[in-house]
A protein has these predicted regions:
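Long, acidic (Asp/Glu-rich), low-complexity accessory segments flanking structured domains
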Residues: 228-246
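A short, Trp-centered hydrophobic/proline-enriched beta-strand micro-motif
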Residues: 122-131, 175
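N-terminal glycine-rich flavin-associated loop
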Residues: 88-110, 137
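Alpha-helical interface subdomain recognition
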Residues: 1-84, 93, 106-111, 122, ...
Length: 399
């Protein structure tokens, strides 16, 4: 086994790693391979985490959560990915953990008291955030889905893309314009967040789902969603009307650090698979791992991953810094480094396997698909570099 215990963890991080690792040990490589191939959500895995309260890792203790911080979340999600679940396995619970953040920070006390304890216990899932739109893409302020006040309700109409896990969620957080873009001084104004009861939306005939036939992260389904006169009670507005975009930004950097940790876990998994195969496979009378053409790409992948890992875990300790721009720099750097390292590592693992690299039975083809995805989500590598160029290097804004 490749030694990757290179980061000094706190006592609490070690406790999280061990507890979550024990759960992950119950789900082997075959479990994830089969669920990915079938496009099946891993209910057993997620339920096992929920039963131990891990979906409430970031929720305050007063609402039944564990009350932990980004440091512990990084350890938790890294452990899940590294266990064999990969990036997609971590993504099956990632949203359940982070979609509650707007409610914690901005929701009414009545809403928090009712819903958050159920989220912490796993009895209610907020697995879905509906933001991206076909025309807006990464330009989130350009969304056109609108929410119009009608008495004690909002009526929502619009179309969203890449809305994931709506098929396994009880609620979703929806971003919509409550003031048209042309009527606000800043393009970041006029967006609001809403908590949507998915079952109620289906019963009213206001949700139309079209599943996207994608090639990565098979255990998580994604959809094009059309909202047709969806009525949402006014008390399900999260926070202050027209300030939803700022609510989305709050906590975004911390989430990117967790994404980076998941990505590092995936990359280490790929390197280990490559090393194991390189030691076992013999050609021309010797193990292929004896050849530098095999050794060097795997060694380089390992080195890059350990650098990204060190940066990610170190940055997680600094998320309480009041300088949010600095936290943003750490988060975007970690995300960029981790995605580049994981992709190179997964590619090396596939190449090491030769023709077997595209055989599902060896898993590395899945790791490569997932590693490629990490260069696109939650933001592209180019957007991460844009942030660094403008906010760290002091270069002119490019967009």
């Amino acid at each position: 086994m490749v030694a990757t215990d290179t980061v000094q963890l706190t006592d609490r991080q070690r406790s999280v790693r061990d507890a979550v690792g024990d759960i992950c040990d119950e789900f082997d490589a075959a479990y994830w391979r089969e669920h990915d191939a079938e496009g099946e959500y891993p209910h057993d895995f997620v339920n096992a985490l929920a039963e131990e309260g891990w979906l409430g890792v970031l929720l305050p203790e007063e609402y039944g959560g564990k009350g932990y911080s980004t440091e512990e979340a990084v350890a938790m999600m890294y452990t899940i990915a590294r266990s064999g679940a990969g990036f997609s396995g971590a993504q099956t619970v990632h949203a359940a953990i982070y979609n509650s953040a707007p409610l914690v920070n901005y929701g009414s006390e009545e809403l928090k008291s009712d819903l958050l304890p159920r989220v912490a216990s796993g009895d209610a899932w907020i697995q879905c955030f509906s933001l991206t739109e076909p025309k807006a893409g990464s330009e989130s302020t350009a969304i056109e889905t609108e929410a119009v006040r009608d008495g004690d309700e909002y009526v929502i109409n619009g179309e969203k893309l890449w809305t994931s896990r709506i098929d396994v969620s009880d609620y979703l957080v929806l971003a919509a314009r409550t003031t048209p873009r042309e009527e606000v001084e800043k393009k970041t104004e006029g967006v609001s967040l809403f908590l949507v009861d998915i079952e109620r939306g289906h019963e009213a005939g206001s949700l139309d789902l079209e599943e996207i036939d994608k090639t990565a992260s098979g255990v998580v389904s994604s959809f094009r969603v059309t909202y047709d006169d969806l009525r949402v009670p006014a008390d399900r507005l999260i926070g202050v009307e027209d300030e939803g975009f700022y609510q989305v930004l709050d906590g975004l950097n911390e989430e990117r650090l967790v994404i980076a940790a998941e990505t590092v876990g995936l990359g280490e998994l790929a390197v280990e698979k490559g090393v194991d195969y390189a030691n076992e496979r013999e050609v021309f009378g010797r193990a292929i791992g004896q050849n530098q053409a095999i050794q060097h790409p795997l060694a380089a992948g390992h080195a890059r991953l350990q650098a990204a890992k060190q940066f990610t875990f170190a940055a997680a300790k600094r998320t309480g810094d009041e300088d949010r721009k600095a936290v943003g720099a750490w988060a975007n750097t970690a995300k960029y480094l981790a995605a580049e390292a994981a992709f190179e590592a997964a590619d090396a693992a596939v190449q090491t396997h030769g023709g077997r690299g595209i055989d599902r039975a060896y898993d590395v083809e899945r790791y490569l698909r997932e590693a490629r995805l990490t260069r696109l989500v939650p933001v592209t590598q180019e957007l991460a570099l844009n942030y660094l160029g403008e906010n760290v290097l002091g270069l002119p804004r490019s967009y």
